Amino acid sequence: MSIPQLDWGGAAPFLVLTLTALGILLFDLFLSVRHKVWLMHLGLTGVLLTMALLVSGFGDQKRVVGEMLILDDFSRFFHLLFLLIAALTFLVSVKDVEQERIHRGEYYALVLFATLGMMVMASAADLIMLFLGLEALSIPLYILSGFLRGQLTSNEAALKYLLLGAFASAFLLYGIAFLYGSAGSTRLDRIAAHLSHGAAWENPLVFFGIGLLLVGLAFKIGAVPFHMWLPDVYEGAPTSVTAFMIAGTKAAAFAALLRAFGTALTP
């Protein structure tokens, strides 16, 4: 088994954001409470640097991590959108962080890790990578939605989001399994090649797989009838986190839907 080659140029935006989040956690250990405001500036610097790398690459297409991620103009557009949402979240969360005595290091790092998950979802050229991106987005959001630990509504929001998110992930994995059983691969280009033959659509596994995949992503979008969790989670989460979830998660799921169905899952 060969280890896939890593295109460092294509992976640079993901690596910069990851290193920024890890750097925030590291500096948070040593900075005094009075100087922790610099953690937000560090996060914004990492976001702006990542945006600069993305803008400089427009017009170029790269495949990263064994062709499981694709970095093209489509994904770069959504990456810039996610990073803009993260930057605005940092700016509007200053008062929330101070008033609610939120741990700044963990807060800013989790926002960046969630943004990284969004970027992976928009760039996924493989259904397994799509699932990993979705989980990288969801797990930080489970924690962020319950960040106000002293409030019962925040605890309730985190628990509901965690349980329903686990169900949605299970549906998504079942859908991926059905599509793999039909096409013999989880790569979108190979699934597209398989489905290009009309006879492939006679296999019921294809429709089960697509249906379950839609259910999993529809939960993240909050599409009817999978929207019942939204009011409780949005009410219990910190205001800045609610804004981040409203804008970011829907854009990420929409990008994943466009990528999957525009590339492979259409007749």
Where are these regions (language model features)?
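Alpha-helical transmembrane segments of multi-pass membrane proteins predominantly involved
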Residues: M1-P267
